[in-house]
């Protein structure tokens, strides 16, 4: 119903930062029946774990800044399509608008792509282990990670994804001030806004006025990197202690 009369349906799965998965196949099929184009932001899933075009989407969107490049040193995005006519219109719009990557930016992206698979594998393994540990910790009230069998979106994620990714979000049983202090007290994990790099990054999302009020005040979004998983856990414990969260 909501898509009637629309020109484009823009989806994101998993969502950021709640890590909710949607039934892409069913939604895309419904949009197609209405003649509505579909674009899917696939940044968190990455092309390794999910293929929106194979599910019928017209456009797959990626922030190349994130996992594809993977070193937090590039600003670049990509649109991918199987439709040659649509590609022609997108390419023309890009050319006329001047949004063309420079050779250095293209080289940085290519460099990152060469290690993309191994980086994603390690980050995902770390995320699975940390999500399991966090889910058993009394200082945490909720962990969102589709790889957990207890996660509300586990079955749906399994049906569309080849893996569960390297993003976790969790709610801390503490005040906003304590959660901010926790994020500021980590020594290995960086308190910053970006994600998808080799380094682990976290932040309290509601510190930004533009973040949705549906996001809990005490939610931490955690982009898990490729560091030693026990070093990461030790840093989390250090941050808990520094913020006096028990």
List the predicted regions and their residue ranges.
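PLP-dependent enzyme catalytic core of the Aspartate aminotransferase-like
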Residues: 119, 200-246
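Conserved small-domain helix->loop->beta segment predominantly found in fold-type I
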Residues: 128-187, 206-214
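Conserved PLP-enzyme active-site core in the AAT-like
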Residues: 1-139
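Short, well-ordered beta-strand elements within core beta-sheets of diverse protein domains
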Residues: 109-118, 165-173, 220-225
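A common structural junction motif
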Residues: 97-98, 185-196, 239-246
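Positively charged, small/polar-rich N-terminal and surface patches that mediate targeting and assembly
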Residues: 99, 142, 196-198, 203-205
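Short amphipathic alpha-helices in soluble, non-transmembrane regions
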Residues: 90, 180-187, 235-240
